[in-house]
């Protein structure tokens, strides 16, 4: 028999059903390396399952943000099989034990939905996850494959960089980095773009001035809507920047060196207070976006207070 196991797991709890523990992160002085959390970050609030679906709900310990994740499974095979599904706080699993035979394929269609919010309760996010998974069942997976392909075709039509005469590895590296930018920025949703994107835990998910200097210029010329969406993070966190300026006896606003919420997140005072160029980086990105798009709507309607406060 073949055993196929699909799990939703909060890995911070330490180990999965096979007792596999995430590697302990070596303690070093490297600021890029994320540390283990001393306390639990995701607090389980709710779990539920049916014959083919499992949903888990969490709340973050400090900020109170909510999260729900659900998975649907469908097995398609002529082989005999037994199925088990179960959930508990912080973990859900769907297990198939298939009596596999030669020439009879085993196919499992799986759909996963995530919903998160700063203020919506977990039970409401459960309903949103259910509706998302219901749509996948009704419409089929191919609809989403086609939508994803269309989005990526549009992205590469304007973002691709061809390196002529260079070794294959150079072209591959350039396109890999462009793909990572797409992953990290496409759904920033007026939040920042983490320094390590969505491919790792380095820098603990913090946003730096690198976004305005390196990432947003590229997006401004290729996908200005995504660039504007990322710039809105600075507009939305202007109140925190004003408070930071007062803490350092400055006028106007001082944007943080590294942040998630808009507050300075660095525990190293020297680095967190020395880099005054960050204000200029942000203003440069805003003005470059306005000039490149020849659209001053975002500048005058939303971003002007940032320019004023950083100039004081």
Residue ranges, per PLM feature:
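Membrane-interfacial loop-to-helix junctions in multi-pass inner-membrane proteins
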Residues: 298-303
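Substrate-binding groove/exosite segments of carbohydrate-active enzymes
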Residues: 142-291
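Acidic/polar, glycine-enriched structural segments that form the non-catalytic walls/loops
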Residues: 1-203
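Short, surface-exposed connector motifs at secondary-structure boundaries
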Residues: 294-295
């Amino acid at each position: 028999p073949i055993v196929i196991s699909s799990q939703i797991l909060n890995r911070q709890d330490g180990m999965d059903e096979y007792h596999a523990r995430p590697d302990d992160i070596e303690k070093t002085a490297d600021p890029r390396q994320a540390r283990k959390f001393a306390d639990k970050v995701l607090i389980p609030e709710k779990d539920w399952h049916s014959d083919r679906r499992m949903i888990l709900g969490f709340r973050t310990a400090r900020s109170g943000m909510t999260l729900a994740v659900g998975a649907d499974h469908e097995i398609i095979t002529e082989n005999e099989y037994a199925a088990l599904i179960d959930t508990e706080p912080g973990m859900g699993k769907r297990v198939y034990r298939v009596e596999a035979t030669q020439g009879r394929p085993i196919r499992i269609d799986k759909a996963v939905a995530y919903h998160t919010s700063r203020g919506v309760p977990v039970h409401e996010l459960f309903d949103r996850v259910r509706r998302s998974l219901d749509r996948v069942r009704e419409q089929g997976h191919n609809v989403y494959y086609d939508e994803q392909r269309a989005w990526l075709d549009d992205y590469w039509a304007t973002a691709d960089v061809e390196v002529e005469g260079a070794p294959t590895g150079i072209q591959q590296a350039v396109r890999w980095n462009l793909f990572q930018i797409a992953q990290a920025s496409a759904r920033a949703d007026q939040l920042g773009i983490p320094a390590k994107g969505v491919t790792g835990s380095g820098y603990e998910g913090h946003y730096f001035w690198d976004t305005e200097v390196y990432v947003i210029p590229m997006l401004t010329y290729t996908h200005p809507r995504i660039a504007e969406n990322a710039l809105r993070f600075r507009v939305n966190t202007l109140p925190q920047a004003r408070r930071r300026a007062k803490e350092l006896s400055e006028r106007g606003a001082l944007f943080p060196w590294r942040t998630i919420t808009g507050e300075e997140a660095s525990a190293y005072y020297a680095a967190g207070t020395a880099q005054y160029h960050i204000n200029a980086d942000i203003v440069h990105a805003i003005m470059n976006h306005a000039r490149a798009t020849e659209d001053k709507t975002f500048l005058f309607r939303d971003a002007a207070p940032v320019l004023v406060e950083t100039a004081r």
